[in-house]
Curated annotation (Swiss-Prot):
GO MF entries: G-rich strand telomeric DNA binding; single-stranded telomeric DNA binding
Subcellular location per the Swiss-Prot or TrEMBL entry: Nucleus; Chromosome, Telomere
Biological source species: Caenorhabditis elegans
Family listed: Belongs to the telombin family.
Keywords: Chromosome, DNA-binding, Nucleus, Telomere
InterPro entries hit by this protein: NA-bd_OB-fold (IPR012340), POT1PC (IPR032042)
Biological-process GO terms, alphabetical: negative regulation of telomere maintenance via telomere lengthening; telomere maintenance
Region (Disordered): 221-251
Protein name per Swiss-Prot or TrEMBL: Protection of telomeres homolog 2
Keyword Ribosomal protein: no
Gene Ontology cellular component terms for the protein in this record: chromosome, telomeric region; nucleus
Amino acid sequence: MSSFDRRIEAACKFDDERYYKQYHRYFDVLAQVHSVVETINGAQMLRVWRGRKFGPGASAERRERRLFHVTQDSFKRYIVPPNPRIGKAIEENGKELLIEIDVYDDHRDGLKNLNSGDFVAIQNVHAASTRQTEMQVLHGGGASYQRGITTVPVDFEHEAFQNFKKKVEAVLETVAYDENFTEFQQPEEVAENHVDEEPQEEALPRGVVLRTETCDFMDMELDNWPEGPPKTFAEAIARANNSRRPRDPPQ
């Protein structure tokens, strides 16, 4: 058996029902590429799916609350955009179908050569965690640590691979193709569509005494204004500068 065959063989053994049990462990996985994304923090995320949700069900909600998923707020750009049908499948069934892998160092070199819809065998993915979040990581080091991303030809003659491929394709056949599918907006588009709220002036609290550079020796106590106390700092300063009501300088 060749090294290529061994990589595919190991990835085909991935157990969907034990995914949420992969905590601080390393695993191989066979999957289909959804997309590759660069985040605003510079991470490069290989996003893949297997056509179904993961288990065990009792752990799903708790683990998903902590697992990192790319959002509009963290999205910077697509390195590889999603195929509209695959993107729609995730939109309809939920992001919990995605495995999103933070790819490091030399493994990044080949990401731009992937296409959404490619089948890949990924070796030695690390189910890592911090205090705030959990995420899947493909560390650097390349083949010396038996880590890597291997593209699997669609006609590869391996029974387990072909069965997996058919299952994913069967799910996609149930999804309507939408050529206008959009998952994320580019950050500049978000900025263009953002409507700024009217700025709110800071309210002027009662009992505050203001002094301005243009009104020497002036104290403005809010209750002493003939036309009523000003409502904001800007109004108070404008009215003070216009009135110029000096008080006697201190003796």
